[in-house]
Structures are given as C-alpha cells and as structure tokens.
C-alpha cells in the first residue's frame, strides 16, 4: 500500500452510504488483501465479509449499506492491540479503494455478529465495520454524532509526544525523522476520540504508552483502548517504513517513570 499518509489524512468514519452494492471486483480485492494482513505481534486476525440480511445483523447508526466486515482473533495478552493493528490495515486499504468504513464496537447487536463470525471457544470478535461507497452527504444523525465526540479535533502534538521522558514535551521542530510517523499517530481514530496514546522518543527509539481514559469500560477480553493503541502502532509503522526508516518492533520496557502503561517500541536498526 503506497501513499499511506494520504489515506490516513483523508479517511473519516462513514456511517452514511449511497445504497450501491460493492462491485464484485472490489469485494474480491478486499477479501484477497485481508488474507495477507500481518501484525508485529504475529497473532493472526481472521476477516469475514457479511451481508446484514443474510446474517440478521443490525447497526442503528449505519444507513445505506448491508455489507459488513468482522474480525476475529484468538484471545491472548496482546490480542486487542494486535487486532487494532491488523483491522486498521484493512480499513486503510478500503480507503485506498474509495470504500468507506466505520469502526463498530458497541453500537450493534454483537451476539449476531459473533454468531456470523463463527467464533471458536477461545476466539473473540473485538470490532466490525460497515463497508460501502460513502454518500455525498452525511445523515443528520451522523453529523450530530461526529459533533458530539469532536471527531475532527485532535490533541496538540506536544500533549501526545515527549522528548526523552514524560517531563519534556516534544515539539514538531525537534521530532526529526519521526515527525511524519508521529503526526500520523496523532491523526489516528480512537474510541470516542479519546486519543489514549502517549509516545516518548529517545535516542534511536520510539516508545508507545497507553494513558487510560477515566470511566472507560473494559472487560478481560475486550479492551477498546488497547485496540486504539494497535491503530496508533499501525499508523506509525506503515508511515515510517514508507519514509524508508529501517525500524524493528520490540516489547522491551525502558522503565520510564510514568503512570501510563507501556505497550511497545520501534527502534532504528
């Protein structure tokens, strides 16, 4: 996938579609690409395209399409963040084709989606997405939802990224080779637009942390803010590599003083 920054910048959640069925060639491309998706945690994610009428699926915030994609993954310690990375790769590929998506976690009849995904005993379906061609105009409901979560707003660069430690905010001017990749992290979507990622840049590495939002519900097997972290890691990794940065993924906690939760790092080779 080339021009990754273009797709990240231009993508938005789409809840209002134009009613056309996806072209068969587009469906085939999506299905084929989904089979190639990998994440740095080496945990496979299975994708399935599903027709709402066939499987009895319902999502009250989506209009104009009957097609959805679900993802499933075997539950493990890193399952949520791995899922977020892989599912965002699918979302960005759909964007590259002009196909709209919207992350769905709670506003759906989850049991029907899970049944359609044919989960095994240790598998979970963290999220799904609608798929379709975006309508030219949003519905009133969609406009109100976006306004309610301030969907087009993002936190300032200096509140998300830090220079060496959490005591020193990182400016764009000092971000150096990491600037583009960090900016694509800043633009990433997140549940209710909470933007829970915090990133510390050291000499030759970038360390990702989760700063949990107060009152944000989670269960043992479903952690939406960990999924958000996977999205952030995906944006960083794809952008850095498109900029020809030779980086490796690792989970090696640098033990920085913080109340945030360490997730993973990327280091220059």
What are these regions (language model features)?
Residues 1-269:
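Acidic, surface-exposed loops and disordered segments
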């Amino acid at each position: 996938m080339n021009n990754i920054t273009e797709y990240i910048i231009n993508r938005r959640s789409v809840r209002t579609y134009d009613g056309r069925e996806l072209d068969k060639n587009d469906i085939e491309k999506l299905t084929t690409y989904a089979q190639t998706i990998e994440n740095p945690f080496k945990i496979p994610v299975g994708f399935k395209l599903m027709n709402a009428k066939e499987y009895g699926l319902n999502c009250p915030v989506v209009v104009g399409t009957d097609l959805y994609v679900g993802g499933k993954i075997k539950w493990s310690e890193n399952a949520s963040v791995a899922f977020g990375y892989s599912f965002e790769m699918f979302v960005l590929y759909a964007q590259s084709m002009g196909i709209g998506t919207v992350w769905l976690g709670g506003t759906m009849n989850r049991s029907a989606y899970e049944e359609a995904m044919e989960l095994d005993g240790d598998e979970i379906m963290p999220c799904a997405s609608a798929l379709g061609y975006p309508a030219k105009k949003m519905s009133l409901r969609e406009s109100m939802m976006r306004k309610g979560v301030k969907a087009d707003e993002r936190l300032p660069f200096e509140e998300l990224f830090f220079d060496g430690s959490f005591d020193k905010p990182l400016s764009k001017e000092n971000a150096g080779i990491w600037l583009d990749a960090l900016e694509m992290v800043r633009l990433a979507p997140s549940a209710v637009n909470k933007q829970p990622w915090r990133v510390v840049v050291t000499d030759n590495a970038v360390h990702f942390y989760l700063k949990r939002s107060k009152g944000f519900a989670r269960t043992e097997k479903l952690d939406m803010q960990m999924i958000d972290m996977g999205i952030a890691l995906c944006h960083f990794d794809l952008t850095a590599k498109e900029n020809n940065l030779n980086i490796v993924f690792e989970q090696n906690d640098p033990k920085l003083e913080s109340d945030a939760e360490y997730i993973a790092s990327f280091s220059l080779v």
